[in-house]
Amino acid sequence: MHPSGGALSVPPGFRFHPTDEELLYYYLRKKVAYEAIDLDVIREIDLNKLEPWDLKDRCRIGTGPQNEWYFFSHKDKKYPTGTRTNRATTAGFWKATGRDKAIFLANACRIGMRKTLVFYVGRAPHGKKTDWIMHEYRLDQDNVDVQEDGWVVCRVFMKKSYQRGLNPADMAAVDDDDLLHHHHHPFPPAQLHGGAADHKHDGAGGHHHHHLMQPHHHYDDFPSFDPSMQLPQLMSADQPPPPPPSLLPGGTASSLQRLPLQYLGCEAADLLRFSK
């Protein structure tokens, strides 16, 4: 049983970062089949009664940093005979974006679909777009031996967390649809992107998805730069390239260290081979 409110109790150090496949084939499949889930940490939520920012408290797991939130919810048809789903809340509404993505098991068997939605504040069709993103997962009824009764499992996060650390030019090159349909990593976005720990998808939700902390770089692993060291001059377009070391008098493989910069990289292996 879930407590009525507050964080779900989990062992110290527990972090919940399921993959798309795990959400569908383990958690949602067991849910619709009324099977027990070993560690039941996904709450049931009425999506129409909660705003995305309320999920941070309602769906908290443990006491550690968290920047994406998970819950089960019923698909609520907007019209009795229609196929459109009502995802309106008091403050706004969730709007589907892009194309649904098929989710496959390792054996190439399709088990379900992932729909991406963006939260808008206000009333359709004139709402204001926010950074809150939701991935809604549904099972393929043809591929499971259970009766799907309207349950879906959802992951909510904030888009901004995935853009932290990018310069303006890089951010401009990011396509919204690619961002929203990012592959979810089994590690928290906090380890994959830079960001603040409580937003996640930073204030906007991340998959993201995770409130990001700046990734830890081991700068000690990089050689120190000596300002007195002279770098080789890049050759001009009019200057012919020098011959490989083996063609020079007394040339050896160690001569590679004195080659111009354009010889470093993928060509270096060929030059080493020629010099033998």
Curated annotation (Swiss-Prot):
It comes from the Eukaryota. One of its GO terms (molecular function) is DNA binding. Its main location: nucleus. Probable transcription factor involved in stress response. One of its GO terms (biological process) is root cap development. The lineage of its organism: Eukaryota, Viridiplantae, Streptophyta, Embryophyta, Tracheophyta. Expressed in leaf blades, developing flowers, embryo and callus. Weakly expressed in roots. This is NAC domain-containing protein 76. The keyword Transmembrane does not apply. InterPro entries: NAC-dom, NAC_dom_sf. Residues 180-253 are annotated as: Disordered. The NAC domain includes a DNA binding domain and a dimerization domain. Residues 206-216 have a biased composition (Basic residues). Residues 196-205 have a biased composition (Basic and acidic residues). It is found in: Nucleus. Residues 10-159 form the NAC domain. Keywords: DNA-binding, Nucleus, Stress response, Transcription, Transcription regulation. It comes from Oryza sativa subsp. japonica (Rice). The keyword DNA-binding applies. One of its GO terms (cellular component) is nucleus. Gene3D superfamilies: NAC domain (2.170.150.80).
